[in-house]
Design a protein with these regions (language model features):
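Short, Φ-rich (hydrophobic/aromatic) sequence segments
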Residues: 39-41, 122, 291-294, 363, ...
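Extended acidic/polar, glycine-enriched regions
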Residues: 88-139
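Extreme N-terminal flexible tails
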Residues: 1-101, 105
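A short beta-strand motif that forms part of the nucleic acid-binding face
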Residues: 58, 111, 164
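Active-site/substrate-binding loop(s) of hydrolase catalytic cores
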Residues: 130-150, 155-315, 321, 326-349, ...
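His/Asp/Glu-rich mid-to-C-terminal helical/loop segments that flank catalytic regions of hydrolases
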Residues: 341-375
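Short helix/loop capping segments that flank catalytic or ligand/cofactor-binding pockets
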Residues: 35, 64-65, 108, 115-118, ...
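Short, P/G- and charge-enriched loop/turn segments at secondary-structure junctions
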Residues: 28, 320-321
């Protein structure tokens, strides 16, 4: 039996794999950082119909150790169809078990979104009416950061921005973007026609390609948490944020959505800008309208989420707060779970890539309703 992680988004360290019933592994920390939680590895040479038991021995020292309670790892035989496997967390680590049907299995923290799939998504997007590669930034290690613009009407005047996967381990964020982009392919979608008559979309499907490739949880290749770099981005340590900010200055912003995943909270929710110094009753009304409209479409809810911050005490190094304050616009962080969505559980898959895609499409419906109210 061989355990490998030498591939896109791979992350694992093998301690002892001599006994299939007591396989001991550890998660490698992020590059230039002590954060860790994301794992993704492949096991070859498994004995079908024999129970294999895995333990991540350093799970208790991970970035969000409390998040392991109630979490179920994901597995796949083909890298396409992922399912949850029985998992338990205790003082000795995270344990999960599988009696495989085949000899090769992948395990991961969440359904991975590969760089290869990202490239196919961008190429497919460029074949959609009105979509162009407006600009391309460069990551610390030289990977492309594509900014796509969707513009179908010369009189459209609003600029709606959606960025994803600032935190590289949050792969549900690019699944969200895939769903959003796929919806733009529908020629008879009246909601999208209404939205794009008034607004252009500015899309960054993956903000942190280096971190995602290397199997990081939180940081880029320089050890920088991009969602703590917006107040003073650096062309050296956070060129990903610096690039997007330059493009925002060039084109303007009328709405901003930052797409994320949350390790601990088993719900879909949003965090707004209520703690910003520039927060106004207008923005409060827009936040309420957005939440109401998105909640009416299924998976989103408002009972669970982050505690509201005190007025005027915002951390402007966060993207949502910085952009909302700078451009006086509706700005949200959209969070999806690594676990299941407890309001609508699907035990076989938990929250998944497919559900993330549907949420992306529901967000477009919400924007179509709100487009006349944004300014």
């Amino acid at each position: 039996m061989q355990i490998r992680a030498d591939f896109d988004s791979g992350n694992i360290q093998v301690i002892d794999a001599s006994d299939p019933r007591r396989i001991r592994l550890a998660i490698r920390p992020d590059l230039a950082s002590q954060h860790f939680q994301w794992f993704h590895f492949k096991v070859e040479g498994m004995a079908p119909a024999t129970e294999h038991c895995f333990t991540l021995v350093n799970a208790g020292q991970s970035a969000y150790s409390h998040a392991w309670s109630g979490y179920q790892a994901v597995a796949s035989y083909d890298g396409e169809r992922w399912f949850r496997v029985p998992s338990q967390y205790d003082a000795d680590g995270l344990h999960f078990q599988l009696e495989p049907e085949e000899s090769e299995v992948r395990f991961a923290y969440f359904e991975p979104y590969s760089r290869e799939r990202h490239a196919r998504l961008v190429e497919r997007a460029l074949g959609i009416e009105g979509v162009e590669r407006l600009a391309v930034g460069t990551s610390v290690q030289g990977r492309d950061i594509e900014l796509l613009r969707v513009r179908r009407h010369p009189d459209s005047h609003l600029k709606l921005w959606v960025i994803a996967q600032q935190h590289p381990g949050e792969h549900m964020a690019e699944w969200f973007m895939e769903g959003l982009i796929e919806r733009l392919q529908r020629p008879d979608d009246t909601e999208m026609q209404r939205l794009l008559e008034k607004a252009d979309l500015y899309l960054v499907p993956n903000m942190n390609p280096d971190g995602a490739f290397h199997g990081n949880l939180r940081t880029n290749a320089a050890g920088q948490d991009l969602n703590r770099a917006w107040l003073e981005p650096s062309a050296e340590r956070s060129p990903e944020v610096w690039f997007v900010q330059q493009e925002m200055k060039r084109h303007g912003v009328d709405l901003f959505l930052d797409i994320h995943g949350d390790e601990e909270i088993p719900h879909v929710f949003a965090a707004g800008c209520e703690s910003n110094p520039g927060y106004t009753p207008r923005l409060e009304r827009l936040e309420q309208r957005f939440r109401e409209e998105l909640m009416a479409r299924g998976e989103f809810q408002i009972r669970h989420g982050y505690p509201r911050s005190a007025p005027g005490q915002a951390n402007l190094a966060l993207a949502c707060n910085f952009v909302g304050q700078t451009y006086d616009c509706l700005a949200f962080t959209i969070e999806m779970p690594f676990k299941d969505h407890d309001d609508n559980p699907e035990p076989g898959t938990g929250w998944s890539g497919a559900r993330s895609k549907r949420l992306g499409q529901d967000v477009l419906s919400t924007l179509a309703v709100l487009v006349d109210e944004l300014r």
